[in-house]
């Protein structure tokens, strides 16, 4: 497993800041996108972070996992809620693999014909 998630999260935030110094408009746009997604308060912070954590798993983004795990804790998510969100991500990834397997079989059949 990863050595130190808190250290990793700190490193990610520092790295974002460093890149943001070189490309401030890009960082501002990225931050604005996050703010726009939260606009309207339809989803509370905890729900948004549970979704973000599940998406981070499906996109295999370790930095996203680190940052959104921290935010999920801050938003008051329980371990059971995090586990349920992750179980949903696992099920969705399995579904994607299943449907892409059907496409692979179709491609094989077409290539064989």
UniProtKB/Swiss-Prot annotation:
InterPro entries: AhpD-like, AhpD_core, CMD-like. GO terms for molecular function: oxidoreductase activity; peroxiredoxin activity. Gene3D superfamilies: AhpD-like (1.20.1290.10). This is Uncharacterized protein HI_1053.
